[in-house]
């Protein structure tokens, strides 16, 4: 039998293709699952065909049984339905009215919504249209304007069947085409019928990888772009991860990034916390399990193809356990460390890590007399507060990638049974004690799903140029350097997922355990330091005076 975590999972935390190991998904408390629906598999030979075995009902039934919401992603045009390339070609008849039988895409949407209504009510329309052919990974061969038409027809046809369907923009990589979303919105907002239909989408989807601090930066930039066009849409991070290149069970001779197994685990803890603090409505890891992984490809899975679990799986369990129920989140970023505070009502979780190779000794305001300090493998100890604070030394980051410290150091959770935000922010010791260089706070509200009006005849769109008056900041991506040979690395054994109290001891990873120090006797120490300093100054002055007077 599948043993799930106590209580229903927090729906905000998801995993792509969690159905591939439903036992592990239930144990880890996965809240939502993204499943690919290939049009070319559903109807491989013609519009009258329907292959229900493409996505077996058992996947959907197990998800429902364990409280996982399923989000569908539709893509991949069959040969019979396009005049363009198979897979990425624009569907035939897309420019026809949504009710025209020759609009093959509209027909598919109505069929899909009818089959899965009540079981899948969130649909992502295609994948990564911002990757232009022939760039590796491209999936859409149409123009940006044609993608808007694809989205619009999908939304109109879906709401003909069910007004409760939520339509998502395709996940965007951002760094392939930084201005894609801005140009898309500029075009969409020129559609005369768009405003009353929310421009035919409810949610913006993002794919963010490798660099921890890119997560809040891209979310904030996306929110600013939406606001520039008068829109306030939820933002989901549908894919995020930092795949390791040093797993001895999946060696890679060349890799684009230098990332250890432990850094993959750190990345998840950091990126999920930062996504919450930036206001993301949901976050999901790509992906759950490495199925059919070709040799030399990056192993994104939290679970290997043989069902053994990487350290990142244990980190994910910490997320679903200690981030669940967050009602507000705050990021305080300092030169040497980052602190994310998650207000969970009766509980408060602080997520801490070093940003550079240097150790960071951090004082954290206490909300209670004691707290649980948990490392990223799940080992924990109880620490006592003194003088209204805790003091923790965070190990420095590995920073082995050519781009620098793309992932912070080993990540620690400080969990207190106390409600409310802390009275003050954490600081590094001895410096800086000033305000953090970045502070972001968001209140997290329950998801709302806006039902769009019933579809109406679609007006003819006239493409317009992107407005030049709106200039928004963009993040310049770092170019990927030439791959270098992967250094030999012997990772630590994957710890068990059960959190067990342990006495303070060196962690089983190359990074040291945090040094927990409690301030005591600070007044007497200060007096002694002053006296010693005065005596030393007097001695130095005496020597100088004797030399000046020739004695």
Model segments located where?
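Juxtamembrane/start-of-transmembrane alpha-helix segments at the extracytoplasmic/lumenal side
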Residues: 515-532
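C-terminal beta-strand-rich structural cap/linker in extracellular carbohydrate-active enzymes
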Residues: 384-426
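N-terminal substrate-binding region of glycoside hydrolase catalytic domains
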Residues: 3-113, 117-125, 130-139
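Active-site cleft segment of glycoside hydrolase catalytic domains centered on the general acid/base Glu
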Residues: 85-201, 207-224, 246-270, 299-306
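Carbohydrate-binding surface patches
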Residues: 332-371, 376-377, 417
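C-terminal membrane-anchoring or membrane-association module
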Residues: 528-551
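Aromatic/acidic polysaccharide-binding cleft in carbohydrate-active enzymes
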Residues: 245-316, 332-334
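Ser/Thr-rich, Proline-interspersed low-complexity disordered segments
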Residues: 2-8, 421-518
């Amino acid at each position: 039998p599948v043993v799930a975590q106590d209580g229903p999972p927090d729906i905000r935390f998801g995993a792509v293709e969690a159905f591939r190991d439903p036992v592990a998904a239930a144990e880890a408390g996965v809240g939502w699952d993204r499943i690919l629906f290939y049009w070319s598999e559903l109807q491989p030979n013609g519009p009258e065909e329907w292959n229900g075995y493409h996505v077996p009902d058992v996947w959907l039934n197990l998800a429902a049984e364990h409280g996982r919401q399923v989000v569908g992603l539709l893509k991949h045009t069959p040969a019979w339905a396009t005049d363009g390339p198979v897979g990425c070609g624009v569907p035939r008849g897309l420019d026809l009215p949504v009710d025209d039988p020759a609009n093959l895409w509209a027909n598919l949407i109505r069929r899909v919504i009818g089959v899965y209504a009540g079981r899948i009510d969130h649909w992502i329309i295609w994948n990564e249209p911002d990757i232009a052919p022939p760039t590796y990974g491209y999936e859409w061969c149409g123009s940006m304007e044609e993608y808007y038409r694809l989205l619009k027809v999908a939304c109109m046809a879906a709401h003909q069947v069910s007004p409760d369907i939520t339509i998502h923009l395709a996940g965007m990589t951002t760094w392939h085409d930084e201005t894609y979303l801005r140009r898309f919105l500029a075009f969409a907002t020129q559609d005369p019928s768009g405003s009353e239909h929310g421009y035919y989408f409810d949610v913006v989807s993002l794919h963010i990888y490798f660099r921890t601090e890119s997560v809040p930066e891209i979310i904030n930039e996306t929110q600013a772009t939406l606001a520039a066009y008068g829109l306030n849409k939820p933002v989901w991070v549908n894919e995020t991860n930092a795949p390791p290149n040093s797993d001895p069970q999946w060696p890679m001779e060349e890799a684009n990034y230098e990332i250890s197994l432990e850094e993959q685990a750190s990345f998840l803890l950091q990126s999920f916390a930062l996504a919450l603090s930036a206001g993301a409505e949901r976050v999901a890891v790509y992906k759950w399990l490495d199925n059919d992984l070709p040799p030399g490809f990056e192993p994104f899975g939290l679970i290997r193809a043989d069902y053994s679990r990487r350290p990142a799986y244990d980190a994910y369990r910490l997320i679903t356990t200690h981030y669940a129920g967050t009602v507000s989140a705050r990021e305080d970023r300092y030169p040497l460390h980052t602190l994310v505070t998650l207000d969970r009502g009766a509980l408060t979780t602080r997520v801490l890590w070093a940003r550079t190779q240097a150790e960071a000794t951090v004082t954290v305001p206490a909300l209670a007399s004691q707290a649980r300090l948990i490392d990223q493998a799940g080992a924990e100890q109880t620490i006592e507060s003194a003088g209204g604070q805790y003091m923790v030394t965070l190990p420095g980051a590995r920073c082995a990638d050519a781009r620098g410290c793309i992932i912070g150091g080993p990540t620690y959770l400080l969990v207190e049974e106390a409600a409310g935000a802390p009275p003050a922010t954490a600081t590094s010791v001895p410096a800086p004690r000033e305000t953090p260089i970045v502070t972001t706070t968001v209140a997290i509200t329950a998801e709302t799903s806006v039902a769009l009006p019933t579809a109406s005849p679609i007006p003819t769109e006239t493409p317009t140029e992107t407005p030049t008056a709106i200039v928004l900041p963009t993040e310049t991506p770092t170019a990927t350097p030439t791959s270098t040979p992967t250094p030999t690395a012997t990772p630590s054994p994957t710890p068990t997922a059960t959190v067990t109290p342990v006495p303070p001891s060196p962690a089983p990873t190359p990074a040291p355990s945090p040094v927990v120090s409690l301030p005591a006797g600070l007044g007497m120490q200060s007096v002694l330091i002053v006296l010693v300093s005065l005596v030393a100054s007097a001695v130095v002055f005496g020597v100088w005076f004797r030399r000046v007077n020739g004695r």
